[in-house]
């Protein structure tokens, strides 16, 4: 099957720092034949020189990333690989400082996630601590609407004793309890014991863990359910913009993922908040010209008369007859995860929704609600603290597109960030639209 016939899945790899995400992805790409021996040899030589033998596969990812960053193409420069059943795009190779921020903007576009946890003594516990990213990433994945998760229990070669079934079971139990509390269907989640370093259970079944009878990592990827394109295609068009390139001979090329609706060559589109628009001249995906783009497609497209200065990351493209909503203010159900003291009216976190990030002030805290039942506990509370859920009204300080969650899920959920941390997560229940004049280029 060619990549056209295979269903396409966007994958995000999450988990605590140093739990082996990059090494696992590197080894996976290598085992599936998406990295040639020559590249690997070169990387190994370089790694040896710098005494980084053990980071062989992680290095590979960084190298691939640098290569791509040097040659900017229209395509969303992501890592791609195929399994027998699917054509995958990894939409964020983790590891950088901005990963949570990227995860918030990227996760809204992921169809599934691989959560990597380390089984090495002390490392799993660090990831699950109050400051741990394992907890934070699982929580964000849930908010961002990712229901399909594969858990890779990594570094099984480093347990005490190595390949310990007891340690594996302990980790699975802890994670199941935590994830169940967040509403994940834990019985549908595969927990695959792997070693990113030795390659155990990535493609080949591990001889070191005969006690494990479940799928390998690649089998677990193939067991994922395909995304429902039909459901999203029926909605009006929404394409959050990730980047805007100037390509010689083509012109301005916004790049993004079609979240809802269908984009065809010849369509008129408008970008909000700026309100500029024009006719779609061409659409490209994975370096190939296409006539129409469906939900889930990562595309670059050229619009007549729209210049690079008119639009930016965070803008959203739609059809002029049903343009994306620019919010004057919006109401949301929020859940507070972290704050050093308390949150009151006037607090201004940065709201990350789809690819946008805009500082927004809390102008009213309407109700405190029970996070489990949604019942109102208190009207007009004076402050909120971690663990509270509430109905809150925000006013964005700059124009921003945000939609009701019920109407456009991918554009109706957000994370609140402050001081480099995720303060809370939320879903939009109502939007008071701002007036924006639409200027279509002839």
UniProtKB/Swiss-Prot annotation:
It is found in: Cytoplasm. Residues 92-95 are annotated as: G3. Gene3D superfamilies: P-loop containing nucleotide triphosphate hydrolases, Translation factors. InterPro entries: EFTu-like_2, G_TR_CS, GTP-eEF1A_C, P-loop_NTPase, Small_GTP-bd, T_Tr_GTP-bd_dom, TRAFAC_GTPase_members, Transl_B-barrel_sf. Residues 6-229 form the tr-type G domain. CDD domains: EF1_alpha, EF1_alpha_II, EF1_alpha_III. The keyword Repeat does not apply. It catalyses: GTP + H2O = GDP + phosphate + H(+). Keywords: Cytoplasm, Elongation factor, GTP-binding, Hydrolase, Magnesium, Metal-binding, Nucleotide-binding, Protein biosynthesis. Residues 195-197 are annotated as: G5. Its EC number is 3.6.5.3. Residues 15-22 are annotated as: G1. One of its GO terms (molecular function) is GTPase activity. Residues 154-157 are annotated as: G4. Its main location: cytoplasm. Belongs to the TRAFAC class translation factor GTPase superfamily. Classic translation factor GTPase family. EF-Tu/EF-1A subfamily. GTP hydrolase that promotes the GTP-dependent binding of aminoacyl-tRNA to the A-site of ribosomes during protein biosynthesis. NCBIfam families: EF-1_alpha (TIGR00483), PRK12317.1 (NF008969), small_GTP (TIGR00231). This is Elongation factor 1-alpha. The lineage of its organism: Archaea, Thermoproteota, Thermoprotei, Desulfurococcales, Desulfurococcaceae.
